Amino acid sequence: MRFLIGLLRQTWAGLLVLLALTAVLGVLYPAAVWGVGRIGAGAAEGSPVRDTTGCVVGSRWVGVDPQVPAGDPDPFFHNRVTGSVAAQDPFAPGDPAGALPTNQGPSSEILAAFVTQRRNAIAAREGVQPESVPADAVTGSGSGIDPHISPAYAALQVPRVAHVNGLSESRVRQLVDENTEGRQLGFLGEQRVNVLELNLALGLTVPRCTAPTAGG
């Protein structure tokens, strides 16, 4: 009899532990993780950037350089070069799905030649001397898909963007200032400009759009 009572007590204790762990690990913990994730719902969904109609035009964390047909006026602010293609083509837009930093080091003659080509091409596009082109305009980032450019590179593009879009340079500079982010925590990194959000502020988006879902 004592054995049976002891067995029942142990079984009951085991069931209580099972129910408690099921409630904590199977319900409360997943609910807490879901709730924390919803605090930054946009970030959890890829930080999509939408235009005024609600269409997704990109992600604020993925830099995709706008492409303009050769010979057409260029109204866009442009990103940094995509690192994944730096060893093949100095001007290729690249594919964010497979973006990686370039494996070309500072002593690479290929990288040096590409940097020179990019500097000359950007100088011609912006109507400035090659030595005026900032370093981030001709080099890829560590990720290869940096969505930001330096305020210096944004300022270099202001006259062209203002002219093509029929805006005053002061108005475009104001938009650049409004889309310039400060250092993280006040001391980490440098000031930076999100290119996608800046182009969107100008009313410019890439010619594609993902319609919002019924719940989005």
Predicted segments — roles?
Residues I5, G26, V33, G37-Q157, ...:
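Flexible, solvent-exposed loop/hinge segments and secondary-structure transition points
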Residues R9, L21, E181-Q184:
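Short, flexible coil/turn micro-motifs enriched in small/turn-prone residues
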Residues W12-A32:
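Hydrophobic membrane-insertion alpha-helices, especially the h-region
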Residues M1-A13:
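Cytosolic-side transmembrane helix boundary signature
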